[in-house]
């Protein structure tokens, strides 16, 4: 079933900034456009936003719309997961392009861990995600999809997002 992801997920950008440097990064462009932080390559944590988790109505929160989970400071992760435990009514989504850079485990069942795959050479990220992050649920984002991904082992993957690159970049 096709669903517009913007209709079912609220962005909660607790951390803004990313060290990966993707040429097609919409987050970096938005940060520059709206002057959110001084240096996008140096992630910053905004703990005041944790209060957004106190909403009673269950929601789906994407916590990595402007960052990569693998490069979060461990102290930030501890604060965030503590607040998540206090607010189990929500689902929390985390996304990374570098699952090899993190080893993480949580007992929380309302945490969803995803990996971005944009080409066939990145398919191994899915297995790396399962090996390096334990807990909750898994998903894969094939977005933007630059080539034919081919056959993929989706064992344990509960959700798939497929999309194209947006914006005006030449050659996309």
Regions found by a protein language model. Give the residues of each.
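Conserved Radical SAM active-site core
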Residues: 1-112, 120-130, 134, 151-154
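Conserved residues at the C-terminal ends of beta-strands
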Residues: 28, 116, 163
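Structural motif
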Residues: 62-63, 114, 141, 161
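A generic structural signal for short coil/turn motifs at secondary-structure boundaries
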Residues: 70-73, 168-172
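An acidic- and aromatic-residue-enriched active-site/binding cleft used to recognize and process polar
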Residues: 97-99, 118, 145, 165
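Conserved C-terminal portion of the radical SAM core fold
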Residues: 124-171
């Amino acid at each position: 079933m096709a669903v517009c992801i913007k209709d079912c997920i609220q962005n909660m950008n607790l951390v803004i900034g990313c060290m990966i440097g993707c040429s097609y990064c919409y987050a970096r462009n938005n940060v520059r456009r709206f002057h959110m932080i001084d240096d996008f390559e140096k992630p910053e944590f905004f703990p005041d936003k944790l209060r957004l988790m106190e909403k009673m109505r269950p929601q789906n929160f994407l916590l990595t719309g402007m960052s990569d989970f693998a490069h979060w400071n461990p102290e930030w992760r501890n604060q965030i997961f503590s607040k998540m435990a206090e607010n189990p009514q929500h689902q929390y989504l985390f996304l990374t392009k570098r699952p090899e850079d993190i080893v993480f485990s949580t007992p929380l069942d309302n945490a969803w861990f995803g990996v971005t795959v944009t080409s066939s050479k990145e398919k191994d990220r899915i297995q790396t995600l399962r090996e390096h992050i334990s807990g909750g649920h898994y998903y894969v984002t094939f977005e933007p999809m630059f080539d034919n991904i081919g056959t993929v082992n989706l064992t344990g993957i509960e959700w798939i997002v497929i999309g194209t690159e947006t914006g005006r970049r030449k050659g996309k």
